Design a protein with these regions (language model features):
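C-terminal catalytic histidine-bearing segment of alpha/beta-hydrolase fold enzymes
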Residues: 231-233, 254, 262-319
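Serine-hydrolase catalytic machinery in alpha/beta-hydrolase-like enzymes
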Residues: 74-84, 91-185, 195-198, 202
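Conserved strand-to-loop "acid loop" that flanks and positions the catalytic carboxylate
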Residues: 233-239, 243-246, 251, 294-297
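A domain-start/cap signature at the N-terminus of enzymes
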Residues: 30-97, 128, 158, 191-211, ...
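Short, solvent-exposed loop/turn and secondary-structure capping segments
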Residues: 109-114, 141-144, 198-199, 221-225, ...
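Active-site nucleophile loop of the alpha/beta-hydrolase fold
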Residues: 135, 211-219, 235-238
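Bacterial N-terminal signal peptides that target proteins for export
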Residues: 4-18
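Bacterial N-terminal signal peptides
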Residues: 20-28
Length: 319
């Protein structure tokens, strides 16, 4: 029998944070949960289409502590953002940049530890520069999140300009390392996957492929400047972002298939199949948009997800 304890703890953490933010409609309203979130499950939730005007964060909320081994950049909204780079280029030039993005309540360090993306790249023989960014929290120690449109607090209420952050982050890494601007790969879990969809909709010229793990498309408008490669992995046992969508912890998520088809339609892919199936494989010129569903997967990061994403990126980049 599957153990959902980690997922349930995340649900309760997000419920507390979401209610606090919604009641106060302010940055300070999203406080740290009393218990530490487990490292292997990452929850994101928000009501799609919610627009909230919040107070501007104080300077204490804008300043981030930069951990040892991390770099930082300043963003247009006045924040200091942190990220870690792992150089696996082995001295090669024009290697892929791989952005690996945590979900609600997660961190760059945890994402690095539990995804095994570096091992998957090594097994595939891919030299790369791997980047682990941190999201934003209301204050030091509060749950970190990404503003993926309709999700998640604190970032969505800040509001934090995460699109600008990723634009600047990609440019900074390209300037500091010998990466290929045509091979910028994004892997996101939960709220991180939602952020991937937002980037695919809004800065497709900066990102060539996204891997979405247990996420959803939560922006109101999606008008990509070009189609990019998308692989969405989702489990039938996901109790946080349900495969069939609907109300989860008071938040309405779109069905997973609807998220994938909506992006594919916006990107100008070939028509969706009318067959009643959870799998999707659509082409948009040279780009490919795919959904893979498994009956045994939960919301937690699954052991083979990193390998699946890397294999997909390698295959589609050579197409």
């Amino acid at each position: 029998m599957k153990d959902f304890s980690g997922t349930l703890n995340f649900v309760m953490s997000l419920r507390r944070c979401f209610i606090a933010c919604a009641v106060s409609i302010s940055v300070a309203g999203c406080s740290s949960p009393s218990t530490e979130s487990p490292p292997k499950s990452s929850v994101q939730s928000a009501k799609a289409g919610t627009a909230t005007t919040a107070e501007q964060p104080t300077s204490s909320l804008l300043d981030a502590v930069v951990p040892n081994g991390y770099s930082s950049i300043s963003t247009d909204d006045g924040r200091t953002r942190t990220y870690k780079v792992v150089d696996l280029s082995n001295g090669e030039d024009d290697v892929p940049m791989v952005l690996v993005v945590h979900g609600f309540g997660g961190s760059a360090e945890a994402m690095s530890a539990y995804t095994g993306i570096e091992a998957a790249l090594a097994e595939a023989g891919v030299d790369a520069v791997v980047v682990y960014p941190n999201g934003s929290g209301a204050d030091e120690g509060s749950p970190q999140s990404w503003n993926a449109g309709g999700c998640c607090p604190f970032a969505m209420y800040g509001p934090v300009d995460d699109v600008s952050f990723f634009t600047r982050l990609i440019s900074t890494v390209e300037a500091d390392y010998s990466t290929d601007p045509d091979q910028v790969w994004f892997v996101g879990h939960s709220n991180g996957g939602m952020m991937g969809y937002r980037l695919a909709c809004e800065i497709a010229d900066k990102v060539s492929a996204i891997g979405v793990a247990a996420g959803a498309l939560m922006v109101d408008a999606c008008a990509p400047s070009r189609p990019i490669n998308v692989l969405h992995l989702h489990g039938e046992l996901d109790a946080v972002v349900p495969l069939d969508g609907g109300d989860a912890i008071g938040i309405v998520f779109p069905p997973t298939r609807a998220s994938v088809d909506r992006y594919a339609d916006a990107a100008g892919c070939d028509p969706a199949s009318a067959a009643a199936t959870n799998s999707i494989d659509r082409t948009c010129g040279a780009a490919r948009v795919s959904l893979v569903v498994d009956a045994t997967w939960t919301h937690d990061w699954q052991p083979d997800w990193s390998r699946r994403f890397v294999d997909f990126f390698v295959t589609t980049s050579r197409a």
